[in-house]
Regions:
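Basic, polyanion-binding surface patches
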Residues: 7-195
């Protein structure tokens, strides 16, 4: 048997694949936009590496590369907005992720509307499905992993927005769009208080 192939008794074949590709299978939640406001400038970055860490208060872990313009802003101000775009914004979201706030006013360049938040200086994005105002509550993993722990402090949504499907990055320039919803709330007896 070759080392790159594993044959189980039931005839299922498995092959190895590069560890550098594991994130293609484990991409977490939907692609989001993270806004910051630093030194008089609002900025937007595209982000897909984030995860929920706690229900209440809502804690969100997110990775922001130290090479990103937003890293300095987030580290300096300790606040941001996580805006959740629907799939009708996918082209703009990808374009936002392919330029830098160092030299581009992304709100103007991509025709997005900044709106004032209630508890943070970073702006909401009016065109998004939802916006979560966040404050950085833990930076202990920033130096080693570029990971910020955020607490959601105020949340907004647009109930009249027609397009509500979000999308997920596969990490290779392809995306998966949310589709059919399967309602199994009745089975969630252990977590009923969170629904």
């Amino acid at each position: 048997m070759r080392s790159a192939e594993l044959r189980y008794e039931r005839g299922i074949n498995m092959r190895t694949f590069p560890l550098s590709k594991t994130f293609h299978l484990l991409e977490p939640g939907p692609v989001v936009l993270l806004t910051t406001f630093h030194k008089g400038r609002a900025n937007i970055m595209t982000m897909s590496w984030h995860m929920m860490m706690e229900f209440e208060p809502p804690l969100i872990g997110c990775l922001v590369s130290g090479a990103n313009y937003s890293f300095t802003a987030l580290r300096g101000t300790r606040e941001c907005v996580i805006a959740i775009p629907a799939v009708d914004l996918i082209s703009k979201v990808v374009d936002i992720g392919n330029c830098s706030g160092d030299d581009v006013d992304k709100f103007a360049a991509f025709g997005l509307t900044p709106r004032p938040a209630k508890l943070v200086k970073a702006p909401l994005i009016a065109e998004c499905l939802a916006n979560i105002e966040c404050k950085v509550v833990d930076t202990s993993l920033v130096n080693k992993y570029n990971m910020f722990i955020l607490e959601g402090v105020y949340a907004w949504s647009d109930p009249k927005r027609k397009e509500r499907r979000t999308f997920h990055a596969n990490g290779d320039g392809t995306f998966v769009v949310d589709g059919r919803t399967i309602d199994l709330k009745k089975k969630m007896v252990k977590w009923k208080s969170l629904l």
